[in-house]
Regions:
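Secretion/assembly modules of Gram-negative surface proteins
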Residues: 1-120, 124, 141-331
């Protein structure tokens, strides 16, 4: 690089830092990439049992600034997901539905220390474009686009309950903490519309009414960590700074009511007719557990996680993911 240009850049950065408030002189930017898979088994008295297998890839970024007792941040993510739904009749498969989804989300949050814990308030927007296809190459039905949009706002309080640490003169220091959390979230789902088509043309138009829901969550987290001091030489700089393992368990409850779904066909025809059905309210209670492990370096982190959840007696799911994230500084 040009020495003069390098010096000018350093001088500009120093001058900018001198004139900016201390709160924005160190603004971390976190970027990440993750991949995961999930399997969901559904069995209800009103429909045939089915299994959904999904694979997803997510890219996310966050900008956070603040001080010791408060934080303000913006987060965004983009997820592409492929799903394979298999309906079953006994031991034989009857029908498969392949689908893809592109999902974007953005969130603004404020996090502040409340007593010995932390409270977080957020506003979140999520939009997804779903595509469906079922059948063989020549005889099939497909829905090219079903746009879904969700707005939500929530509050989460986290409280450390017990903690301990042990210092080591020759090896890594150790620490552990047990925390509890509780939160409440309001969600609004916009109307959605899509058309099933065959090679001959439109078959059915689906219109889903808007809906609202309130979700509550409560649970606990146990975290244990090993802390490594930076050493001399190349290995001392690149070795991990922290290894941690955590176990999270939570109980979630959702109250949302039913949602009307209108089915119209043939779409746009002179003989079109409409039928209004009611989508059942989701299961009221759901529990989930997650086991996670992470390796942290000075400016990056690698995370592994696996989870299992159950909603009532009809929905069981399990999955896992791996994520790599990096920390950058704007200034």
């Amino acid at each position: 690089a040009d020495p003069d240009w390098t010096e000018r850049l350093k001088a500009w950065r120093t001058n900018l830092q001198e004139h900016l408030p201390a709160v924005v002189q160190d603004v971390p930017v976190f970027i990440g990439a993750s991949a995961g898979s999930t399997k969901v088994d559904v069995s209800t008295p009103v429909s045939k049992p089915f299994t959904v297998k999904s694979e997803d890839t997510t890219f996310d970024a966050a900008v956070i600034f603040g001080r010791e007792d408060w934080r303000v941040g913006l987060m965004g993510s983009f997820t592409t997901r492929s799903l394979d739904t298999l309906y079953k009749q006994g031991a034989a498969a009857e029908l498969g539905v392949d689908s893809e989804s592109d999902e974007a989300s953005a969130s603004f949050f404020v996090r502040r220390r409340l007593g010995s814990g932390w409270g977080t308030v957020d506003l979140t927007w999520l939009e997804a474009d779903d595509r469906y296809r079922m059948g063989a190459a020549r005889e099939y039905l497909e829905m090219e686009k079903l746009k879904r949009r969700i707005y939500s706002s929530g509050f989460l309080y986290e409280q450390p309950l017990f903690a301990g640490s042990a210092l080591s003169g020759s090896g890594p220091d150790r620490s552990w903490v047990i925390s509890g959390f509780a939160g409440l979230r309001y969600l609004r789902v916009d109307t959605a519309e899509g058309t099933w088509r065959s090679p001959a043309g439109a078959v059915l138009t689906i219109r889903e009414a808007s809906a609202q829901a309130v979700a509550a969550t409560a649970g606990g987290v146990i975290t244990g960590a090993l802390h490594f001091a930076p050493g001399a030489g190349y290995w001392g700089q690149v070795k991990p700074r922290r290894l941690d393992v955590s176990l999270t368990a939570a109980l979630n409850s959702t109250v949302g009511g039913d949602r009307d779904v209108m089915v119209q066909g043939p779409a746009g025809g002179s003989t079109s007719s409409a039928t209004v059905m009611t989508a059942a309210e989701p299961e009221r209670f759901q529990w989930n557990a997650e086991l996670a492990a992470g390796i942290e370096w000075r400016d990056s982190r690698l995370d592994f996680s696996g989870f299992a959840s159950r909603a009532g007696s009809s929905v069981r799911s399990a999955g896992g993911s791996v994520k790599m994230s990096w920390r950058l500084n704007l200034l």
